[in-house]
Amino acid sequence: MEQKPSTLDPLSEPEDTRWLDGKRKRKSSQCLVKSSMSGYIPSYLDKDEQCVVCGDKATGYHYRCITCEGCKGFFRRTIQKNLHPTYSCKYDGCCVIDKITRNQCQLCRFKKCISVGMAMDLVLDDSKRVAKRKLIEENRERRRKEEMIKSLQHRPNPSAEEWELIHVVTEAHRSTNAQGSHWKQKRKFLPEDIGQSPMASMPDGDKVDLEAFSEFTKIITPAITRVVDFAKKLPMFSELPCEDQIILLKGCCMEIMSLRAAVRYDPESETLTLSGEMAVKREQLKNGGLGVVSDAIFDLGKSLSAFNLDDTEVALLQAVLLMSSDRTGLICVEKIEKCQETYLLAFEHYINYRKHNIPHFWPKLLMKVTDLRMIRACHASRFLHMKVECPTELFPPLFLEV
């Protein structure tokens, strides 16, 4: 430390004391220089700009002055804890403050902070600091919402051609979807005693209630026929070779039937309505032959209920499932892929038009395609067991074909 001439002779101090002071200064200097090498430096600072208090490398504009992190923290703690009345100086307040000596005299360092213009009134107490942080977070959230709304406003709506395609697909769905929007009024609940007493043993440990299975097979043929009719009403589908049409229908039939059942999930009665007419509970569908597939369809129904899909969205999702170019054995793979892309683009633009409140609605909805694919795969495995355990005469021919 530098000080005014004094009657005290520094050489009169014990040698050990002088050695310890020097060692402490060197160690302090090394730590401070090391800490100043890292950290974010704002773009408004000149290269190697110095702290106006101690001369160390400045990190920004703090309490109305350009200072380093060390002097910023020292000033803040001093004011927040009201420490300055307790500070004292051994050398009559005449210490020179630099990055090596700054930690050795708190009073002179604080006086230097004040003399260069650091503002005490800008230091916030704990409650004000918490309030400021909260305000910053609220502003960030507000800006994020504004940006999201702005991005939604700039997302394209369907073009005139896409609206025409959307209309065709929607009408195809409505004309082939049993009971339409009146399914709740027209549904009939499967009697509770059916599907509660499994009889035929299955190889995987589950059992099949043959009475429930028989009830389900009565509605399966009309349900499959309606899926076929839906596909035939789509102009792009009818332009494909018959071989490809058959492959696409076999591939998507279970997926579309599962989707049509899932969107008719009723949380109040905890039922799915099959083919627009038969309301069944989870255990009934499970014991009626579907086993774990029943859980997957019910779970899908629960999750889709939050999406509040309209007829058009269900119809377009069905068209996307139908036009899947990765089905094995297809001839016109490229043409089918382009058809699906056309449906997907129109679908995405329609989602933009609808302006759902669910964050990331579009990608979340597309994930349901994967869920439906998994349901189909599980059903295919389950179907092999059913063919072994259930009487052949109970299977409708069309069901066996798809």
Swiss-Prot record:
Cysteine pairs bridged by disulfides in the record: none
Q: Where is this region: Modulating?
A: 1-50
Q: Which domain of life is it from?
A: Eukaryota
Give every NR LBD domain span.
161-402
Residues with Phosphoserine modification: 12, 28
- Please give the residue ranges the record annotates as the region Disordered: 1-22
Question: Which parts of this protein are zinc fingers (NR C4-type)?
Answer: 51-71, 89-113
Annotated Pfam families: Hormone_recep, zf-C4
**Which stretches are labeled DNA-binding?**
51-125
Which positions bind Zn(2+) 2?
89, 95, 105, 108
Can you name one GO molecular function term for this protein? nuclear receptor activity
Provide the residue positions that the database annotates as binding Zn(2+) 1: 51, 54, 68, 71
* UniProt keyword terms in alphabetical order: DNA-binding, Metal-binding, Nucleus, Phosphoprotein, Receptor, Transcription, Transcription regulation, Zinc, Zinc-finger
Annotated localization:
Nucleus
Ranges in coiled-coil conformation:
none
Q: Which GO terms describe its biological process?
A: cell differentiation; negative regulation of transcription by RNA polymerase II; positive regulation of transcription by RNA polymerase II; retinoic acid receptor signaling pathway; thyroid hormone receptor signaling pathway
Q: Can you state the subunit structure given in the record?
A: Probably interacts with SFPQ.
Query: What is the annotated role of this protein in its UniProt record?
Result: Nuclear hormone receptor that can act as a repressor or activator of transcription. High affinity receptor for thyroid hormones, including triiodothyronine and thyroxine.
Its family remark reads: Belongs to the nuclear hormone receptor family. NR1 subfamily.
Reproduce the free-text note on domains from the UniProt record.
Composed of three domains: a modulating N-terminal domain, a DNA-binding domain and a C-terminal ligand-binding domain.
In Swiss-Prot or TrEMBL terms, this protein is called Thyroid hormone receptor alpha
Taxonomically, what lineage is the organism? Eukaryota, Metazoa, Chordata, Craniata, Vertebrata
Per the record, the gene is THRA
